[in-house]
Amino acid sequence: MKKYLKHAGADVSASIVVLLVALPLCLGIALGSGAPLFSGIIAGVVGGIVIGALSGSQLSVSGPAAGLTVIVATAITKLQVYEAFLLAVVIGGLLQVILGFLKAGVIGDYVPNAVIKGMLAAIGLILILKQFPHLIGYDTDFEGDESFIQSNDQNTFTAMFEAIKYITPTALVIGVLSILLMIFWESKFIKTKKSLKLFPGALMVVLVGTIVNEYLRLSGSSYALEQKHLVTLPVAESAGAFFSFFTFPDIQFLKNPDVWMSGITLAIVASLETLLAIEAADKLDPLKRVTPTNRELKAQGIGNMVSGMIGGLPLTSVVVRTSANISAGAKSKMSTILHGSMMLLCVMFVPMILNKIPLCSLAAVLIFTGYKLAKVSLFKEFYVKGWNQFIPFVATIIAILFTDLLIGILVGICVALFFLIRSNFRSAVMVVNDDHNYLIRFRKDVSFLNKPIVKKKLEEVPKNSFVIIDAERADFIDKDVIEEVNNFLCHAHLKKIRVEVKTGQNKSTKNIFSIPQITEE
């Protein structure tokens, strides 16, 4: 407990920032999923408190994810009854716990670094592009939408141009003022003032935006922002009304195969998104701590079971909230737990105050977070590393921008695999010749993709040559390649080619070639 109290100041400050970022995202994702608004809040609270406590990650923040929006909306429509969907969420959570015990968390280790960094940069760009309309008061799409094709039938870019046609002057002024304040709060001047450092920039932005709009409203100005441009939390008039927001799964739907299919789909997609987000969180962590991924799957599974049992949306670890948490200076998991606790207290006791916060102020916070994720220096870093790193990095960004997170990641992995295979293809077989003396050396892993080049080089060996086939440095040689070499060995004497074979003591390559015994006639 002492290690958490040691950084209490930083964690409390960061938790406020995460709360301000998470609230509209929870509501927006619930709206975009076609679920009750309060289901997003439930998921946010459970993600903060339950998963925050059980997770081995010190900085990851869980909550309802934009990447599950389409899956959730489809499942709710297909199942028709929300209680049946909640049962699917519980089943999905149970399957995640099982995946954790089966040690499926290792999957995340196979995603290349260029793809993970590309995902982070893409999310940063998405935040900037998607929040721009909210910054200037065009709030037609729900908060947290990350897909290229939006729920209002526009795409990321057309929405920006459309937003310019319908600028809300007050939102524009507050939004620009908020960004300038965020930049100022990052300056050396603020960092040298201990008293000001205690207040996170995001909190100051929200306070200034709220005060400006409240002043306009109380003075009767027509420039005051309407409620559609503000946070909109469900408000309960009594304790009974508050508890009526909770919904419970109906076990009679266990017989419905669609419930099970929805649960399996949620488990697979939520687990993949979580593992990717955890990889990203570990790379963003200044202390480079490593999260136990199997424990994370178990924590996510328990969180999803709890969320589904009380009416909440499915959960994953979320990069946007995590990056906001790290950017705000969080040091431990107390920040995550505190943000969930404060969210619960806020919706219980002060929802009417939170409903005065302008969305344009929160958009400024998210845009600034996006900028930190997609800095120009990151692009330069991968460009310097070479094309085999830069192209998968850029491909991941472009694919995520024009599709969604999971499809973009898969595209990035495929591009990275192409460069890996290409590199291995080039280095696996080396051919050197001096007059009629040939050296054919196999290195690393020689796959079936190397068969054409091996076949071609062996066929090109002229009569009366001397050939050394060296497999001492090979870890693996595909059977198709072995067959080609054996075929060459079998017929080499017909062209009066002398062959020496070296296989070394490696068990995987020793005695793999059939050296014929040729007798002189």
Give names to the regions the model predicted:
Residues C26-G28, G48-G56, I71, A75, ...:
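Alpha-helical transmembrane segments of multipass membrane proteins
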Residues Y4-S13, V21, L25-Q58, F253-M334:
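Membrane-embedded helical hairpins/re-entrant loop segments and their flanking transmembrane helices
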Residues L54, G67-V89:
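Membrane-embedded helix boundary and interhelical linker motif in transport proteins
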Residues K372-E521:
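The feature marks cytosolic C-terminal regulatory regions of anion transporters and related permeases
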